[in-house]
Structures are given as C-alpha cells and as structure tokens.
C-alpha cells in the first residue's frame, strides 16, 4: 500500500517563526501567532479521518524573504496550528522533509503536504536514510 496524501496545499502567507510564538517566558501566545493559527485553521479545518495510530510525514517548502531565516523555525508553529483543526497530534509525525526558498518580500509562502505512511514504508525509509546502520530491517 502506497502512502496516502491527506492534504496538499500552498498557503500564500509568510512562514511563522518559532521564535515569535510566545512572550512572558512562553506563557502567552503573541497576537501574531494567534493570527497565524487562525489563518491555518480557516484553510485546513476539517475531518481528515486521521487515526491516533497513523504515522504521518510532513513535506514542506517555505518561501522566506529573509535570507537569515532558519528552516527549522517554521516546523513548530505550523504543526501546532495544524493539529487541533485536523485532528492529529504532532507526536504522530515520524518524518519531515523540508526545503526553503528565497523570495521577494510580500511573496512568502508555505507549501505543505501531509501523508499517512504505512509501517512498511516507515521501516524502508529508515533503511534508505541510513543504509550503513541497517535501521528498520527485519532480523
């Protein structure tokens, strides 16, 4: 069984940085983060039939206008915004494939795809990533 795409979308919005999610020692969400979460909810809210036992793969390309932006800063705010409106927990994400692109200011975006992986695919992916260590192979 091949992986099943749950959602694939381009969001014409600036990727949000994990560094700007909270203030007051991480206790309060920033206004900008609340707005980002609301936008993601409007775009993605729905019943996707994701089960608690599903293994998920997130694939994304983020278009940043700042050449100083770190790719990994996009993961946490995006996943935390997706999970309540799509019905999954980010602990179900077993693989993230990501790239960044530099774009002009005002042309920022997030392209994302969320796939359901089979156990067999998950084991094969581990072996492909580090063949030297024989990860995911049956003994």
Predicted features and spans:
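Acidic, proline/glycine-enriched N-terminal capping motif
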Residues: 1-139
């Amino acid at each position: 069984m091949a992986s099943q795409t749950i959602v694939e979308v381009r969001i014409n919005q600036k990727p949000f940085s994990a560094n700007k999610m909270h203030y007051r020692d991480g206790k309060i969400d920033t206004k900008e983060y609340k707005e980002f979460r609301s936008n993601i909810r409007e775009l993605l809210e729905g019943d996707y039939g994701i089960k608690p036992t599903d293994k998920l793969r997130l694939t994304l390309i983020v278009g940043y206008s700042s050449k100083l932006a770190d790719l990994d800063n996009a993961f946490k705010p995006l996943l935390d915004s997706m999970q309540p409106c799509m019905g999954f927990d980010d602990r179900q994400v077993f693989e993230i494939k990501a790239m960044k692109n530099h774009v002009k200011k005002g042309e920022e975006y997030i392209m994302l795809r969320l796939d359901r992986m089979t156990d067999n695919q998950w084991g094969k992916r581990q072996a492909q990533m580090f063949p030297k260590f024989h990860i995911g192979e049956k003994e």
